[in-house]
Amino acid sequence: MRPSELTQLKQDGRAISILTAWDGLSAALVEAAGADVVLVGDSLAMVALCHATTLPVTVEQMLHHTQAVGRGFTRPLPQQPLVVCDLPFLSYQCGEDKAVAAAGSLLKHSCAAAVKLEGAEPEVLAVIERLVRMGIPVMGHLGLTPQAVHRLGYRRQAEDPRSQAQMLQQAKQLEQAGCFALVVEHVPSSIARCLSQQLTIPVIGIGAGEDCDGQVRVTADLLGLTPSQPPFSPPLIQGRQLCVEALQGWVKQLHQQAETATTTTSQPEPDC
């Protein structure tokens, strides 16, 4: 899967599926599920590294986890999902050269074929244009942007006409800057539908209704592995509970075997 193929999927009316992965095991599961795109999201800061937000994760850590994702795939390269890697906080907000170095490192030394950036500020648009000129595909991200948690929080975005008009303008700017797709998170379905209709590039929703060109989800949330999930991403199974019960069963069985062994007739020790 190549970035340019996602636009064709939109034109064909086929929903685009994106799931996150953070190591080889999760990558193998997502690949087997048939997802079009694997996102190595900076959400791994919380899912895999137990941070409270996405902010602490570094470029080096993103590279480490993306390399692990690549090793988890089992299919030949042409049949593998497209891998998009998040550029973490302050890896692209501090200048174009730093952004090019970070994105270039991810594409050179891992299976990533594209990067994702949050926001549409003038500085971010300039970075996107520079990356695209350098041959690095870029996915945009508007709405709830976790890297801006201290400014915006986790509340739903674009709820009034003024902010919706601003989002539409920003989305068009991102498309013009060269983004091949756009993620919109935790926004009303009406604005997501409008974006999908007015943009040529695919609009991928998470908590943005069902009228987008595709959907992205954090795999650990869908599997119920995280302690809690966002209201717009309910779990499909209670994976955390199932795993704990299975491991508890093993521990219990081990203890029972030990108790049984102590109550049986002892056998003479063999000569060593």
From Swiss-Prot:
One Pfam family named in its UniProt record: Pantoate_transf
GO biological process: one example: pantothenate biosynthetic process
Keyword Transferase: yes
InterPro entries assigned to the protein according to its UniProt record, in alphabetical order: Pantoate_hydroxy_MeTrfase, Pyrv/PenolPyrv_kinase-like_dom, Pyrv_kinase-like_dom_sf
Biological or metabolic pathway of the protein: Cofactor biosynthesis; (R)-pantothenate biosynthesis; (R)-pantoate from 3-methyl-2-oxobutanoate: step 1/2
Cellular compartments per GO CC: cytoplasm
EC number(s) recorded for this UniProt protein: 2.1.2.11
GO MF annotation terms: 3-methyl-2-oxobutanoate hydroxymethyltransferase activity; magnesium ion binding
SUPFAM superfamilies: Phosphoenolpyruvate/pyruvate domain (SSF51621)
Active-site residues (renumbered): E185 (proton acceptor)
Domain of life: Bacteria
Keywords attached to this entry: Cytoplasm, Magnesium, Metal-binding, Pantothenate biosynthesis, Transferase
Residues the record lists as binding 3-methyl-2-oxobutanoate: D42, S43, D86, K116
Cofactor: Mg(2+)
Family matches, as PANTHER family: 3-METHYL-2-OXOBUTANOATE HYDROXYMETHYLTRANSFERASE (PTHR20881:SF0)
Function description: Catalyzes the reversible reaction in which hydroxymethyl group from 5,10-methylenetetrahydrofolate is transferred onto alpha-ketoisovalerate to form ketopantoate.
Protein name: 3-methyl-2-oxobutanoate hydroxymethyltransferase
Lineage of source species: Bacteria, Bacillati, Cyanobacteriota, Cyanophyceae, Synechococcales
